UniProtKB/Swiss-Prot annotation:
Domain notes: The basic region and the leucine zipper structure are necessary for association with HOXD12 and PRRX1.
Chain intervals with Basic residues compositional bias: 173-183
Keywords: Activator, DNA-binding, Nucleus, Repressor, Transcription, Transcription regulation
GO MF entries: DNA-binding transcription activator activity, RNA polymerase II-specific; DNA-binding transcription factor activity, RNA polymerase II-specific; identical protein binding; RNA polymerase II cis-regulatory region sequence-specific DNA binding
Gene name per UniProt: MAF
Expressed in which tissues: Expressed in kidney, brain, lung, gut, mesenterium, testis and ovary.
Compartments, record wording: Nucleus
PROSITE patterns per UniProt: BZIP
Identification of the protein by name: Transcription factor Maf
Region (Leucine-zipper): 302-323
């Protein structure tokens, strides 16, 4: 590799930053026809702007949803007229987005690149400038900073866009490239991870709320699929089943405490407390209903017994009145018999003169 690059002579810069990029990438395997310098710079700027955004699996879903052709991926020849600035800008472009290096699969025109560069000011992507930031860090670690004339016009455009993004959406903060899967996808399809491709940083919460639209399924739909924060996943694929639907009221009441505790293993403490309070409320409600039913039933029984006793009292009263009438009849008959017998026998001293004698 060093012998191949030595052929170019003084075409390559000798700064530590440029040599670092030369050692990292094999430039001889990219055989792409050279394009004009102005178009190269515009396309490289657009490539850096869209490097950290959400990329879909379809190449041409949006004007800047895919990577434009590399400006100069062929090794510099001694007779080429390109200067050192162009090569340094190409290195910035390569580190910003290394995951798609096949420029022939995409037909990206300079007009699309200019339009994407203009639209990038309306949709700031703070995570799109990792390559530029890494370049600055490497330059500082090497013991010197790259002058402004070596960085070229593309770096100035990148700095201006970074300032515009910071003014519109606050200071951009960068996340580590941890692939947090979403907890709730569109149809339980595995969730669209934050890191859409290696080398692209996930957007901040402010940019994700602005650009995160569309359902992020397993294959990635449009240009902005599944950008929401992973901890705010919706209720998909059966993971957030509410326990009110799992246990009916009758099951909660009739289930034993041991069985309920076995069913609630792995459930949060708040959910367990809420379910047990609901079970206690249902039990108290059932106990109150049973007591109310028993009271009503006992009242009906007592009322029926009272009616029976009243009927018996009426019957006894009727019996008493009948017996009184019979007594009066017998008494009257007796008095008649006593008066008739006294007249027949006459009055004598042996016979008593009063009817009490015969009694």
């Amino acid at each position: 590799m060093a012998s191949e690059l030595a052929m170019s002579g003084s075409d390559l810069p000798t700064s530590p930053l440029a040599m670092e990029y030369v050692n990292d990438f094999d430039l001889m395997k990219f055989e792409v026809k050279k394009e004009p310098v102005e178009t190269d710079r515009i396309i490289s700027q657009c490539g850096r702007l869209i490097a950290g955004g959400s990329l879909s699996s379809t190449p041409m879903s949006t004007p800047c949803s895919s990577v434009p052709p590399s400006p100069s991926f062929s090794a510099p020849s001694p007779g080429s007229g390109t200067d050192q600035k162009t090569h340094l800008e190409d290195y910035y472009w390569m580190t910003g987005y290394p995951q798609q290096l096949n420029p022939e699969a995409l037909g990206f025109s300079p007009e699309d690149a200019v339009e994407a560069l203009i639209n990038s000011s309306h949709h700031p992507l703070p995570g799109a400038f990792d390559g530029y930031a890494r370049g600055q860090q490497l330059a500082a670690a090497a013991g010197g900073s790259v002058p402004a004339e070596e960085m070229g016009s593309a770096a100035a455009v990148v700095s201006a866009v970074i300032a515009a993004a910071a003014a519109q959406g606050g200071a951009p903060h960068y996340h580590h490239h941890h692939h947090h899967p979403h907890h709730g996808g569109g149809g339980g399809g595995g969730g669209h991870p934050h890191g859409a491709a290696p080398g692209s940083a996930p957007p901040s919460s402010a940019s994700s709320s602005a650009a995160g639209s569309g359902g992020g399924g397993g294959g990635g739909g449009g240009g902005a699929g599944g950008l929401h924060h992973p901890h705010h996943g919706g209720g998909g694929g059966g993971g957030g089943l509410h326990f009110d639907d799992r246990f009916s009221d009758e099951q909660l009441v009739t289930m034993s405490v041991r069985e309920l505790n076995r069913q609630l293993r792995g459930v949060s403490k708040e959910e367990v407390i809420r379910l047990k309070q609901k079970r206690r409320t249902l039990k108290n409600r059932g106990y109150a209903q049973s007591c109310r039913f028993k009271r009503v039933q006992q009242r009906h029984v007592l009322e029926s017994e009272k009616n029976q006793l009243l009927q018996q009292v009426e019957h006894l009263k009727q019996e008493i009145s009948r017996l009184v009438r019979e007594r009066d009849a017998y008494k009257e008959k007796y008095e008649k018999l006593v008066s008739n017998g006294f007249r027949e026998n006459g009055s004598s001293s042996d016979n008593p003169s009063s009817p009490e004698f015969f009694m």
